[in-house]
C-alpha cells in the first residue's frame, strides 16, 4: 500500500457524501495502491447517522474503509485512530467538512514523494470562513510561536491535509484526544528534527454547517500548550 488518508467525518451525515465522492474521483487518478479511511466514530446513545452513511459509501466505492467506533475522546482521538488504521507507506489526514480543498492532497503528496520531507502540510493564505474562526486561528498560531522554539517558520499549525511518512508517524508519541493533536504532530516533528514543508491553499466556508470550535477554544489551546511545555521540561530534568 503506497498511500492512505484518513477523513474525519464526525457528525457530517449526508454532507460527507459529495466530499468523499469528489475525493475518491481525485484519488482514482493515482496509479498506485491507495485507500480512504472514513473515520465515523460516534458517541454512544447519539442519533448520529454518519457511520451508516459512510458504510453505504464504502459499499459502492472501492478502496474505501470505514472506522466507526464508540468515541473515547474528541477530535484528536478520532485523528489518532484514523492514522493508526492507515496502512500506506505515506499516511495523511484531512477534515471531511469540505473547507480544505481535496486537490491539496495531490500537491502535498507530490511534494513529499519528490523531496526529502517527513511531513508536508498546508497553510491557509485566503480564508472564506468567519471572522470568529480567523481570529481564533491568528491568536492560536501567535501563542504557539511565542511558546515553542523552532516553530517560527510554520505559518498555520492546524491546517490540513497533513501527509507524512509512516516511519515518521511511528516515532511520534501522540497523547491528545482533542484539538491539540495537530499541534502535537508539529511539536513531535520539531523535537525529532523531522523535515516539514507547507503549501499554500484557499480555505472555504462551512456553508450552513455550524462550527465545532467553541469560544473557549483559545483557553483550552493555551492550557494544552502550557501542559506540553511542563511535560517536556519534566522529561528533560529526569533524563539529566
Model-derived regions, located:
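A structural alpha-helix within SAM-dependent methyltransferase catalytic domains
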Residues: 20, 24, 55, 83, ...
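Acidic donor-binding segment of Leloir-type glycosyltransferases
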Residues: 23-67
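Acidic metal-phosphate-binding loop of nucleotide-sugar-dependent transferases
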Residues: 43, 73, 98-100
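Acceptor/aglycone-binding surface of glycosyltransferases and processive sugar-polymer synthases
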Residues: 63, 67-85, 90, 102-179, ...
Amino acid at each position: 500500500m503506497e498511500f492512505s488518508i484518513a477523513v474525519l467525518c464526525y457528525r457530517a451525515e449526508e454532507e460527507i457524501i459529495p466530499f468523499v465522492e469528489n475525493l475518491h474521483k481525485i484519488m482514482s487518478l493515482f496509479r498506485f495502491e491507495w485507500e480512504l479511511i472514513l473515520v465515523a466514530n460516534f458517541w454512544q446513545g447519539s442519533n448520529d447517522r454518519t457511520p451508516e452513511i459512510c458504510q453505504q459509501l464504502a459499499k459502492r466505492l472501492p478502496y474505501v474503509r470505514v472506522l466507526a467506533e464508540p468515541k473515547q475522546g474528541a477530535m484528536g482521538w478520532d485523528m489518532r485512530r484514523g492514522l493508526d488504521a492507515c496502512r500506506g507507506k505515506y499516511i495523511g489526514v484531512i477534515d471531511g467538512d469540505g473547507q480544505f480543498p481535496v486537490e491539496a492532497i495531490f500537491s502535498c503528496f507530490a511534494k513529499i514523494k519528490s523531496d526529502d520531507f517527513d511531513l508536508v502540510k498546508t497553510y491557509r493564505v485566503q480564508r472564506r470562513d468567519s471572522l470568529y474562526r480567523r481570529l481564533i486561528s491568528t491568536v492560536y498560531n501567535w501563542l504557539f510561536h511565542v511558546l515553542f522554539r523552532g516553530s517560527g517558520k510554520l505559518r498555520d499549525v492546524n491546517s490540513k491535509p497533513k501527509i507524512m511518512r509512516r516511519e515518521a508517524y511511528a516515532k511520534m508519541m501522540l497523547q491528545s484526544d482533542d484539538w491539540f493533536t495537530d499541534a502535537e504532530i508539529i511539536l513531535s516533528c520539531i523535537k525529532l528534527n523531522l523535515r516539514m514543508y507547507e503549501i499554500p491553499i484557499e480555505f472555504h466556508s462551512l456553508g450552513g454547517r455550524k462550527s465545532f470550535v467553541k469560544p473557549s477554544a483559545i483557553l483550552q489551546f493555551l492550557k494544552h500548550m502550557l501542559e506540553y511545555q511542563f511535560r517536556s521540561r519534566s522529561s528533560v530534568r529526569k533524563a539529566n
